[in-house]
Amino acid sequence: MTNQAPIPVIVNGAAGKMGREVVKAVAQAPDLNLLGAIDSSPEHQGKDAGELAGLSEPLEVPITNQLEPMLGYVAGERQGPPGVIVDFTHPDSVYDNVRSAIAYGIRPVVGTTGLSPAQIQNLADFAEKASTGCLIIPNFSIGMVLLQQAAVTASQYFDHVEIIELHHNQKADAPSGTAIQTAELLAELGKTFNSAIVEETEKIPGARGSLAEEGIRIHSVRLPGLIAHQEVIFGAPGQIYTLRHDTSDRACYMPGVLLAIRKVLQLKSLVYGLEKIL
């Protein structure tokens, strides 16, 4: 039994669907302490984060839209380990959120997708200069990591592959960060996929999906009723090999989120992807 003080945690995007799950998971973890709950939505200001997340008892942590004061408050807590902020916000704000957190010495765990490669590199440089750990994780599901590993193995034997990602219609960015990461992992093999057999003509622009690295196509679907789903489809003469991961409940991401909160304290730079800390 350890007597170490719990890790102070801020949840940014606490009123969102993922944010509420994170609030519940953090509140139920004995080694974590929810100190702040940030959200920009006016209708949730002042509400108790625990009650909003569906917990039976209030946490006495009110929702606020004041990020910088909360970062300063947690940074000023000199007892125990450094603070961690979990960000599930919006592609338009996540870059500034992460820079602000690092500037205060707060370790970011980022689940928000939509950051450009240039933004990720800038954050990596900033985190390294500050010797501050930062995790950017497109998908916190252990099952998705296993799918990606299986896809990398399969891509050694198949020359044709396409990715289909399906999400709820409130997701702002496309393709998903997970689909982009999957394509990047396949592209690391250094082979070119999907060499054209015929000269293709798109009668409607975008009909063949977006073109990622090394000829890999990504198709995005946005519909109500979906949460998060991905297929990686390999083809060869006479056969199709399909890998698929389906999310039926956002609770499946919480083991990965909690692992990331604990692991980010051990880092001195930015790390991209859940597979790097498993």
Swiss-Prot record:
<dbReference type="GO" id="GO:0008839">
    <property type="term" value="F:4-hydroxy-tetrahydrodipicolinate reductase"/>
</dbReference>
<dbReference type="GO" id="GO:0019877">
    <property type="term" value="P:diaminopimelate biosynthetic process"/>
</dbReference>
<dbReference type="InterPro" id="IPR000846">
    <property type="entry name" value="DapB_N"/>
</dbReference>
<keyword id="KW-0560">Oxidoreductase</keyword>
<dbReference type="InterPro" id="IPR023940">
    <property type="entry name" value="DHDPR_bac"/>
</dbReference>
<keyword id="KW-0220">Diaminopimelate biosynthesis</keyword>
<dbReference type="InterPro" id="IPR022664">
    <property type="entry name" value="DapB_N_CS"/>
</dbReference>
<keyword id="KW-0028">Amino-acid biosynthesis</keyword>
<dbReference type="InterPro" id="IPR022663">
    <property type="entry name" value="DapB_C"/>
</dbReference>
<comment type="similarity">
    <text>Belongs to the DapB family.</text>
</comment>
<keyword id="KW-0457">Lysine biosynthesis</keyword>
<feature type="binding site">
    <location>
        <begin position="111"/>
        <end position="113"/>
    </location>
    <ligand>
        <name>NAD(+)</name>
    </ligand>
</feature>
<feature type="active site" description="Proton donor/acceptor">
    <location>
        <position position="167"/>
    </location>
</feature>
<protein>
    <recommendedName>
        <fullName>4-hydroxy-tetrahydrodipicolinate reductase</fullName>
        <ecNumber>1.17.1.8</ecNumber>
    </recommendedName>
</protein>
<dbReference type="GO" id="GO:0016726">
    <property type="term" value="F:oxidoreductase activity, acting on CH or CH2 groups, NAD or NADP as acceptor"/>
</dbReference>
<dbReference type="GO" id="GO:0051287">
    <property type="term" value="F:NAD binding"/>
</dbReference>
<dbReference type="GO" id="GO:0050661">
    <property type="term" value="F:NADP binding"/>
</dbReference>
<comment type="function">
    <text>Catalyzes the conversion of 4-hydroxy-tetrahydrodipicolinate (HTPA) to tetrahydrodipicolinate.</text>
</comment>
<feature type="binding site">
    <location>
        <begin position="13"/>
        <end position="18"/>
    </location>
    <ligand>
        <name>NAD(+)</name>
    </ligand>
</feature>
<dbReference type="GO" id="GO:0005829">
    <property type="term" value="C:cytosol"/>
</dbReference>
<feature type="active site" description="Proton donor">
    <location>
        <position position="171"/>
    </location>
</feature>
<dbReference type="GO" id="GO:0009089">
    <property type="term" value="P:lysine biosynthetic process via diaminopimelate"/>
</dbReference>
<comment type="pathway">
    <text>Amino-acid biosynthesis; L-lysine biosynthesis via DAP pathway; (S)-tetrahydrodipicolinate from L-aspartate: step 4/4.</text>
</comment>
<dbReference type="InterPro" id="IPR036291">
    <property type="entry name" value="NAD(P)-bd_dom_sf"/>
</dbReference>
<dbReference type="Pfam" id="PF01113">
    <property type="entry name" value="DapB_N"/>
</dbReference>
<keyword id="KW-0520">NAD</keyword>
<keyword id="KW-0521">NADP</keyword>
<dbReference type="Pfam" id="PF05173">
    <property type="entry name" value="DapB_C"/>
</dbReference>
<keyword id="KW-0963">Cytoplasm</keyword>
<feature type="binding site">
    <location>
        <begin position="177"/>
        <end position="178"/>
    </location>
    <ligand>
        <name>(S)-2,3,4,5-tetrahydrodipicolinate</name>
    </ligand>
</feature>
<feature type="binding site">
    <location>
        <position position="168"/>
    </location>
    <ligand>
        <name>(S)-2,3,4,5-tetrahydrodipicolinate</name>
    </ligand>
</feature>
